[in-house]
Amino acid sequence: MKPAPLILAFDVFGTVVDWHGSISREVAALIPGEDGDAFATAWRAGYKPAMAEVRSGKLGWTKIDDLHRRILDQVLLARGHDLDESRRQHLNRAWHRLAPWPDTLQGMHHLKHHFTLCTLSNGNLGLLANMAKHAGLPWDLILSAEVFRHYKPDPQTYLGVAEVFDVKPAQVMLVASHEDDLDAAAVCGLQTAYVARPMELGPGVRTQHGDLSRFTVAAQDFNDLADRLTNAWPTQLPT
């Protein structure tokens, strides 16, 4: 059996919070007649390409708030919307107001009794702090790509968590709903927990997944994850 993880580091967008549903609702409220689902999908589609520019060095270090704003302006132009600056700023900060999944808070509070919980997100620190306040997320520490000046899946992000807590990489478990994130963490020696989020991309959109047995644990939601982890290491966890 692997050693009990001491630190659970969580991906946030899609794993902890429902970005698609939250953004869709904000768009529909701000831009009457707009298809919120389609807008959310288009906005998110620019996320990885924008980070790739930073990771490649084509673009200097740029926090996610600023990347989101750049993509937002492009999506608004492409979809024929001329919002004033105030409304653009309000909509861009919708990423600070994302709603948690229904199981998130209960599962996290259960896990918090046994593990140290932190974020490992590409979101910037201010965004993650505001989101935690808005959604009531009980983090012990907020860590971000901004801390390491590297975006996931750069190894510096995963190994950075172990360095911050002064533990071995194997004592950190990444919790995520994205297999590529988990695979990159595993290469760095972290343990991995896959959590299914079938509605992440919106209604009617399903993603195919590979063999989940390659991960340390695979769970249906955060409550299931808490049960699996506490059952796997019943004598090693503090009471």
What are these regions (language model features)?
Residues 35-41, 45-89:
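A metal-dependent, Asp-based hydrolase signature
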Residues 85-134, 142-145:
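Substrate-recognition element of Asp-dependent hydrolases with the DxDx(T/V) motif
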Residues 23-27, 43-47, 68, 91-95, ...:
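Hydrophobic alpha-helical core bundles mediating ligand binding, dimerization, or RNAP-core interactions
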Residues 19, 98-101, 139, 215:
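Tryptophan-centric aromatic hotspots in well-structured domains and transmembrane helices
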Residues 2-6, 109, 123-239:
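Asp-based, Mg2+/Mn2+-dependent phosphohydrolase catalytic module
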Residues 1-45, 76-78:
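Active-site neighborhood of HAD-like aspartate-dependent phosphohydrolases
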Residues 22-29, 42, 70-74, 90, ...:
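Alpha-helical elements of Rossmann-like donor-binding domains used by nucleotide-donor carbohydrate transfer enzymes
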